[in-house]
Amino acid sequence: MPLRPHFLPTFARFGARFAVFALLLAPLAACQQPGRLTAQPPQPQVAAPPAPAAPAPMPAPTAESLPLVPPPDAGRSVPVGFLVPLSGPAAAFGQALLNAAQMALFDLAAIEGGAEVALLPRDTKGTPEGAIAAAEDVMASGAQLLLGPLFSADVEAIAPLARARGVPVVAFTNDYAVAGDGVYILGFTPEMQVARVVDYAASRGLQRIAALVPDSVYGQRVAAAVRVAVQNAGLNLSTIASYDPSASTNLVSPVVRDMTNYEGRRAALRQQRQQLTALDDEASKLALRRLERLETYGDVDFDAVVIPESGGRIKAIAPLLPFYDVDTRRVRALGTIDWDDPDTWTEPALVGGWYPSTPDAPRAEFAAAYRKLYGATPPPRASLGYDAAALAAVLARSDSASRFTAAAITQPNGFAGVEGIFRLTPQGLAERGLAVKEVGSRSSRVVSPAPTTFEQLTN
């Protein structure tokens, strides 16, 4: 069936009230209409995710042990592997991803027509060896698609096995190094985040960008992304400074002092005072009195600085800017999606800063439904489990010969999920439509809304 532009049918719901997911401009969606949920899902028998500090080990569940998901019709079900850590240090997050996936499959069960997904959850134990065993197990059971693993090392370990069997992988990592050749990553890459916030800074007239990054693989990726984004936006790169990611704030402080040319600006102030003192006119005396209130003389050579930290770390580093006499009302701090946290908004040095984000409403609806079912607040990005399972369920309803082909998975019009619109590219990366928010005083607000179609990004 031909594509029908601007047709945005719902294909999943959070209960009867929330219509959040849509398959954008795709033949499959144009051929189907959602059914209404007539029954509430049974209360899940899965315990709420334990605290990350001490996750409780749990056995790998099987498809038969997941009461939230209605049993698929064996005659028309499509096996899909779900590979996440359900034991080990990351068990809590792995369980949250699985919980979210169960929600998606229950919601999608309301849609009539086509095959249904038979989810095959397996415990990767958070190790490459565990991931290999889990992948081999589900593929031996006929899995036609693998959702997960979580960690890039695990994805790298299973990729050759999946390719050998022609089974595509949709992983939860954000490491682009493992993407491609049948492996797709759903995670939020620093590259897409930096590009969005730097583009917005350019649209607001900022011209000179700096970056303060940890000296780590992640920091190097951010630094490279800043260079590319600055060049693409036609801006000027001021400086990129790095620090030991394990260093205390006291050891990061000298890096910020040098980056802001603090000593040079103090020397400029002393020189200016000496020049004015040598003069004996009233104007010079007035100017000298004004300089007495200053700590430095002259501005820093950047209008914005990218700081890819979060939590307590960003709250410790950001105050170093005003400490070294940088006016944060004029110099914008630019962050990552991890700044979308009320605790981060309590830092005065970040007020006025910008960061990328996903649309609030779908995430809030997902979180409310998750809390109702599991009695706990989902951790950030647990919704990727929902998006992945919903993607699999929708594609499973297409013709068996084309349901999980590269062409189906990489539909250019994309999909809309809990975290906004996204599409998977032939290179295996996820492109997303992100909003930009501004940090307020213990609050944040959207200053550039997320697009609702990819046409808005390309036009």
How would you label these PLM feature ranges?
Residues P2-L24, L28-N459:
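Extracytosolic ligand-binding ectodomains
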